[in-house]
Every structure is written in structure tokens, then in C-alpha cells.
Amino acid sequence: MALRVVKKTCVDVCFLVQGMLENNVYFISDGEATMVVDPSSDAEEIMRALDGRELDAIVLTHCHSDHVGAAADLRRLTGATVIASKIDAPEICGEKPISRDNWKFKTCPVDFRAEDGDVVEIGNMAWKVMVTPGHTKGGMCWYLVPQFGNHESGAPVLISGDTLFEGSVGRTDFEGGSMKEMRASLRKLAFLPDETIVLPGHGRQTTIGAERSRTFAQWA
């Protein structure tokens, strides 16, 4: 499947759709470093899409199998640093059992365990980590402002995983989910600028401004 380009962002963003749940697998680069977000199911397809580029980091927004299924193979093939939240990392790397609502997947070592408020530098990109429970206990969003991208006139970017979608939010009825926590997470995201481009784990990209009048109004 061909890579699709996300336009008007402050960094280079493109994506593949993988797996039966149609996960968005993002490739993000500032021209120096490259990261892949949520390698869903096919590491070989991701390698072909990289087309020889060095992969610096693999970011896992949460512990569900449709977001981490190819992480172990991709780490083995590239040597890239795997980053997940400190809360969800134990399930990803096999330190704790897979939750009852999660499908079995190949466990993957987590090289860096991020916490809320961390700033993670990948190349010249400096991503702010926002832990946003609700879908899972340790789900996280990553936020980047234009001064740390390679397109200063582009919009800020939010990697939202399964927290925020176009017109909706992630399910909260799985083990570790909580609508109360989801509402609090949405209120945190609502402080971001309207022009922020949202890169969700499934479905079409959106903006914070577009979701302010629908998703935030309904759920937050």
C-alpha cells in the first residue's frame, strides 16, 4: 500500500493503513531523524515504506495489540529505540500478562519509558508527552510545536493514538478504560491551539479546532 501524505504539518508526516482494524501507522521525520508510530501488523511492509531510511524511534501510544503487533520485528530489523509510557510498558514487554480485552501479540522490549510532561528529543524534534488515560491506563499523546519541526509555517501536530478521533473518542469499556479519565484527558487536550493537526490511531486526520465544537463539547 502506498504511503499517504498529511499536508500542512510542521514536520513531514505520512502514513500506512494496516490490519483488520485499519490502523494508521505514521512515519514522521524532520529531515534528519525518522520515527514510526504504532507499527500495527506488518514490519516488512513498514521496512519497504522506509525505503532504506534509518529508523531512529518506534513510538507506541498504548499497549493494544493492533498498535504494537509489529513492534518487536521492527525493532529487530532496525535497532530503533522503542518508546512507550511507563504505565503501559510492562504489558508491551511481557512483564505483566496481556489484559483480557487485548489480543495476543509478540512482546517487545521497551527502551525508554515515558512519563507525563517528559520532552522526548528525536533528531531536532522535541515532543511533549501527555499521558491521557481513558482508553488504557497508560495511553499517551505526543505534541510538537513548529519551532521543533522542519516546516516553521506548518501547524502543530498531536499524535493522539486512540484517545481522540475525528468526531469521537477511544472506547473506554476495555480493561483499564475509564470514561471519567477519558473526559479528564480530553480537557487536557482542549488547551491545545485550534490549528493543531490531530493524527489519530484510526480514521481521518482532524484538528483540535474541529473537535472543539463536537468531540470536546460532547465528551469533555
Language model: regions and residue ranges:
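Short, basic/glycine-rich phosphate-binding loops at helix/coil junctions
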Residues: 24-30, 91-92, 163-168
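Active-site HxH/HxHxD metal-binding segment of metal-dependent hydrolases
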Residues: 41-125, 145-148, 214-217
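Hydrophobic residues at beta-strand termini and immediately following loops
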Residues: 16, 114, 132
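Metallo-beta-lactamase
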Residues: 34, 97-98, 126-220
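Aromatic/hydrophobic pocket-lining residues that form the small-molecule binding cavity
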Residues: 39, 67-68, 182, 186
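Residue-level detector of beta-strand structural context in well-folded domains
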Residues: 24-26, 112, 117-118, 140, ...
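Conserved beta-strand hairpin/beta-sheet module of binuclear metal-dependent hydrolase folds
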Residues: 2-53, 141-160
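Conserved S/T- and glycine-rich ATP-binding loop of Class I adenylate-forming
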Residues: 28, 61, 132
